Swiss-Prot record:
The entry's keywords: Antibiotic resistance, Cycloheximide resistance, Ribonucleoprotein, Ribosomal protein
UniProt family annotation: Belongs to the eukaryotic ribosomal protein eL42 family.
Protein name listed in UniProt: Large ribosomal subunit protein eL42
UniProt record, GO biological process: response to antibiotic; response to cycloheximide; translation
GO molecular function, one term: structural constituent of ribosome
GO cellular component, one term: ribosome
Signal peptide per UniProt: none
Additional observations: Confers resistance to cycloheximide, an inhibitor of polypeptide elongation.
Amino acid sequence: MVNVPKTRRTYCKGKECRKHTQHKVTQYKAGKASLFAQGKRRYDRKQSGYGGQTKPVFHKKAKTTKKVVLRLECVVCKTKAQLALKRCKHFELGGDKKQKGQALQF
């Protein structure tokens, strides 16, 4: 279980800052895939009409987790940076700090 605080004081690469400032932390989420990307247009054109599935569908999945990516936004200049963490099954943002002698809860 990885628990990350919602704010973090870290280096800001922004032109105004270039020093350690407070950053707001959120979890990165991939955007919706565009229907107009060249690969998607080609794929849709190929799939249309008769003839079933035209490209191989990937089945041999090897990984059970994804790497967690944090999105850090500087509170001073609003510059955004991304920071990849290690793989983990349980990720929590701004959860309660653990106390001594207490059982883990999911």
